[in-house]
Amino acid sequence: MDAILGEVTLSRRRKKLDEMTKGEGLGDAYATTLSRVRAQQRSRSKLGMEVLMWVSHAERALHVDELCHALGVEGSTDLDIRNVPAIETLLACSLGLITVEKSSCTVRLIHYTLQEYLFHNSDLFLGPHSMIAEVCLTYLNFRHVRDFSPTLDSIPPTIPFVGYASCYWGTHARRETTESVKRLALELLEGYDKHISSKMLILHGMDCWGLPLDEDRRPEGFSGLHGAAYFGCEEIMVALLEMNKLDVQAIDLNGNVAMTWAARRGHSGVVRILLQRNDVDTNIADTEYGQTPLSWAAENGHEGVVRMLLEQNNVDLNMVDKYGRTPLSWAAENGHEGVVRMLLEQNNISPDMSDKYSRTPLSWAVGGGREAVVRMLLERGSVDPGVADTQDGQTPLSWAAEHGHEVVVRMLLERDDVDPNIADPQDGRTPLSLAAENGHEGVARLLLQRNDVDPNMIDTECGQTPLSWAAEHGHEVVVRMLLERNDVDPNIADTKDDRTPLLWAAEGGHEGVVRMLLERNDVDPNKADIRYGRTPLSWAAEDGYKEVVEKLLERNDINPNKADIQYGRTPLSWAAENGRNEVVEKLLERNDVNPNTADTQYGRTPLSWAAEGGRKEVVEKLLERNDVNLNKDDTQHGRTPLLWAAQRGHEEVVEMLLKRKDVDPNIADTKHGRTSLWWAARNGYQAIARILLERRDINPNKADTRDGRTPLSWAAESGDERVVGMLLERNNVGPNIADTQYGRTPLEWATRNGHQIIATLLREQLGLVPRYAPSLPSTELSFPEPSEPSEPPSKRMRRF
């Protein structure tokens, strides 16, 4: 232990401790350190052991403030903040056996092995739980706590321990109830209407219990009996009942009586105490869910409580809650075999009662895969295994198949009164269909082994077969089992979109399923759906499933150019737009793939789509084809691939296209007559403008047909000094060309928008060098004297 404490950081201490746990003698090290703790000065020894007791026996990790306040309780009538020790003191007194987690600000033992050591050496602490319970109750009874008006969302920093105290006092009291604990608990619970601390118990304690807190739902009906019943404090419950002041049938804000809480939590001792009274109604239901004590005990699997309640002659075994569910229904769903067995042994039990959704106990047990419960229920001759529920229309077999409960399916199929082909009325799904969709191989195998199972039944929701569902989700083993059946038709398309299993598999990228289906000569690889008219190759190409595309292209009867009916787009078109480089490469390896096929919607080629999207790798692959048409314009805007790339700002694509001599850099779109240079200047794409202007055959003065504006006009208006400078470096640039819409020159556009430097450059280009600048908004400029030498625009631009 000295070696551990000798390390200077917490990380190194833990590392050293982990090394020690691999060897022997760690218990001796803990014993030695605990002896040192006890050998300290009396008050420090007492505090050190109390710290270890709290940290090792608390129900959850305590925050620093919580632990400090807990150790500051001395049994007086109010909290004295002067008695609260500092965390540094606690750390010192425990001699390094505890640590503070910085991230959560909680106090923990230095290692999990110390927790194990303290658990096995329980004689180190005398009555730890009663001591903790006493501190919790004392804290809650403090005048300072009582006088505080609690809120639902926070605990004030002045009383940080109230949260833990209200949530866990009963847990500790149930384990060890001394006379002192009982006295303090009665003071708290009996004085519910007097003490605000009792309300604190509800407001914060119920939050800890996982119950909803609502400011408008005051716990008026809550009494001390509810608290004692919830925690299972038997001696406190007896003491409260002996006072004869509290109504044992009083309900809390959720409509629970004390018996309900005791049964729900499985506190058989408290249930026994309450059952000895004549004024306890064992069939009372809570107002929130309508469940009786028996129903709650059955749902949570508390066999001891269920047994005691069943011994009462007046208990109603078949009483239903607001959902129409019986105790047997709840026990069956949760797989509580012992409870189910006890209930089925009762003569007046109704084992096949349906709830409001027509689900029986068997249906719930099957849905959860509760094999033993299913077996017990099926042994009852009065249980019908073919009853379908009204919510989803599923039978027990359908539920079991959907969730993959193979053993349950086998048990049900052994029954002569179970129809393996029955489809639910809601969407017409058979058990095989559900098993195939979810990939439950064992269930599918059991069903397919039966000759009376129809593998081609289509559902009413989507019109899909089991093979279609399995193919869509890529369940290869199930697909293989289905294809091994001679009566399975692999080409049955669904009735919704007319999609075949192959199309579903291709769209999902399920290469293994595609391979198995294509091995069948009777599978048509070109069958398209009716909604979009797209083939399996089209879907796979769009999503970039290279392996699927390869398998499809291996078929001799594949049509790689088949366009869809909605947009008239080929697989290459879809792959090019989405940047599926490997798919594009595979398609272009085929000589029968036409790279220039334009779609029917916009008249765009694969190169056009790739250029617009900046798919440079795809563009590169397409340019390797000698038969690609570089200047093909679309029917929507009349734009070529170069125009699309320039308009979208894809510099690298523009550069690749311009390397081809057969690309016309001056071609304009047919809609507004805009060139690539026009788009670059308009949108401020300086790099693209530079690349275009490097072409000797570029026309820098070509204006659009809508406004009659040149690239220089747009650059001057937007204030793009670099583009203006690059344009003015061209000897053939017309700096004084006016547009046709407003009749403004580039100089006028620059002046109107306050671009002073550009205006100066244009004046110099035009030979206009005035002494003073024209009046500009909020700015006055001076210009060189006419006698002063003026730098050429190109030299001036190099400064910028």
Q: Would you name each region that the model predicts?
A:
Residues 735-777:
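Leucine-rich solenoid repeat scaffolds
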Residues 235-236, 269-270, 304-305, 338-339, ...:
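Conserved ankyrin/ankyrin-like repeat signature
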Residues 239-247, 272-281, 308-315, 342-349, ...:
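Ankyrin repeat domain, specifically the short helix-to-loop turn at the C-terminus of the second helix
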Residues 221, 255, 289-290, 324, ...:
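Start-of-repeat signature of ankyrin repeats
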Residues 1-269:
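Leucine/isoleucine-rich amphipathic helices and adjacent mixed helix/strand linkers
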